[in-house]
């Protein structure tokens, strides 16, 4: 039903306008008690065998919404209603910013992919922190907060910008993510180099600890799929050394070659980060490499090209304790979360593993 609707309606609309329209519907639905209860019962079924513990947090399952969909923390309950076990908001920057000029979001329907050059459009850390502080949760879900650099802040002043966001947002976050991997903010990916990343992560960790003294807010870093293998290893080693809680692998890619893209050259040639199905192989490769390097010492989150329960299961076997998606949600619609949960539960029952935790990294351990 949704695929027909997408073909007849959403596919004919500007992608960003369609996003805002869908967003509005989700937010409206969650405001009606009877409707949200019915929708959650239908689309967010709970499977006991999928219960997950990660980052010191308990979740209904391992499957969550990647950052980028809810940039301003306005639809957390709506996304939980649709079956996401954790919702990562953002990317949020120190100061509010409009992002890059439109048109900045493109669908590659033939490739089940998106290209975006949104540029961290968001309300800024002060406004988002206030929104989170005033929120009365309807559904119990884990909320991650993804922070990035304000565009106008020079690279040499980036640490202070991230620290400002961390101090404001850490009190309202179940976990924090340092995003240094978006291709749409000039110079941002330079911060993935360990000599720049070390002081940044250390400063954000200290800022979060200053802002929240009653608990330790887990801190993760999100990396790009375009890192060379030796740089992936370097980030993994640094994460362990600094006592980071996790790594999210991966963000969007700037690559176009070797991905088997069949969409029109004009679309494929659009500047920005590519997400969705074509990213699957490289994101999985990075995840496997990370798990081989860090094992169970830190939590790994697999994202990039996750479309089906089988994809999610593959990420778990490759070392992911948590799995995220976003692009496939655009193509699969509101029933996607339900299908992911049902498929994952079935896959676990068919496997030799008693729990999801037993399955994490099993393929990598088998070949090491």
From Swiss-Prot:
InterPro entries the record matches: Aldolase_TIM (IPR013785), DHO_dehydrogenase (IPR050074), Dihydroorotate_DH_2 (IPR005719), Dihydroorotate_DH_cat (IPR005720), Dihydroorotate_DH_CS (IPR001295)
Subcellular location as annotated: Cell membrane
Annotated GO CC locations: cytoplasm; plasma membrane
Chief localisation class: membrane
Residues forming the catalytic site: 182
Cofactor, free-text remark: Binds 1 FMN per subunit.
Entry GO MF terms: dihydroorotate dehydrogenase (quinone) activity; dihydroorotate dehydrogenase activity
Record's keyword terms, sorted: Cell membrane, Flavoprotein, FMN, Membrane, Oxidoreductase, Pyrimidine biosynthesis
GO biological process: 'de novo' pyrimidine nucleobase biosynthetic process; 'de novo' UMP biosynthetic process; pyrimidine ribonucleotide biosynthetic process
Pathway membership, UniProt: Pyrimidine metabolism; UMP biosynthesis via de novo pathway; orotate from (S)-dihydroorotate (quinone route): step 1/1
Topology versus the membrane: Peripheral membrane protein
Cofactor: FMN
EC category name: oxidoreductase
Positions that bind FMN: 67-71, 91, 146, 179, 222, 250, 276, 305, 326-327
Binding site for substrate: 71, 116-120, 179, 184, 251-252
Catalytic activity entry: (S)-dihydroorotate + a quinone = orotate + a quinol
Enzyme Commission no: 1.3.5.2
Primary role: Catalyzes the conversion of dihydroorotate to orotate with quinone as electron acceptor.
Quaternary structure (record): Monomer.
Family recorded in the similarity comment: Belongs to the dihydroorotate dehydrogenase family. Type 2 subfamily.
Protein name: Dihydroorotate dehydrogenase (quinone)
Gene name per UniProt: pyrD
């Amino acid at each position: 039903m949704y695929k027909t609707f997408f073909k007849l309606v959403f596919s004919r609309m500007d992608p960003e306008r369609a996003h805002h329209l869908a967003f509005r519907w989700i937010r409206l639905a969650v405001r009606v008690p009877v409707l949200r209860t019915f929708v959650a019962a239908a689309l967010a079924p709970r499977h006991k065998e999928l219960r997950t513990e990660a980052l010191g947090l308990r979740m209904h399952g391992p499957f969550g919404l990647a950052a980028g969909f809810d940039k301003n923390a306005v639809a957390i309950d709506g996304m939980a209603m649709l079956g996401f076990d954790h919702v990562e908001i953002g990317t949020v920057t120190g100061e509010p910013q409009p992002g890059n000029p439109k048109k900045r979001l493109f669908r590659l329907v033939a490739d089940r992919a998106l290209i975006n050059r949104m540029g961290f459009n968001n309300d800024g850390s002060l406004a988002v922190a206030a929104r989170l502080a005033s929120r009365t949760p309807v559904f119990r879900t884990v909320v991650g907060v993804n922070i990035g650099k304000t565009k106008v802040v020079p690279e040499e002043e980036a640490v202070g910008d991230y620290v400002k966001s961390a101090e404001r947002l850490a009190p309202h976050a179940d976990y924090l993510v340092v995003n240094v991997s978006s291709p749409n903010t000039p110079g941002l990916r330079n911060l993935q180099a360990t000599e720049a990343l070390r002081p940044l992560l250390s400063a954000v960790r200290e800022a979060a600890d200053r802002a929240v003294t009653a608990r330790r807010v887990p801190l993760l870093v999100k990396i790009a799929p375009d890192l060379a293998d030796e740089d992936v290893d370097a980030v993994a080693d640094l994460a362990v050394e600094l006592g980071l809680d996790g790594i999210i692998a991966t963000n969007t890619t700037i690559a176009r070659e070797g991905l088997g893209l069949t969409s029109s050259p004009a679309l494929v040639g659009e500047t920005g980060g590519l997400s969705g199905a074509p990213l699957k192989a490289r994101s999985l490769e990075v995840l496997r490499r990370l798990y081989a390097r860090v094992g169970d010492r830190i939590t790994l989150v697999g994202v990039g090209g996750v479309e089906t329960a089988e994809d999610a299961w593959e990420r778990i076997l490759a070392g992911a304790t948590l799995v995220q998606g976003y692009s496939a949600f655009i193509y699969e619609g509101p029933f996607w979360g339900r299908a992911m949960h049902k498929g994952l539960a079935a896959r676990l029952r068919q496997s030799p593993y008693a729990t999801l935790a037993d399955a994490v990294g099993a393929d990598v351990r088998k070949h090491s």
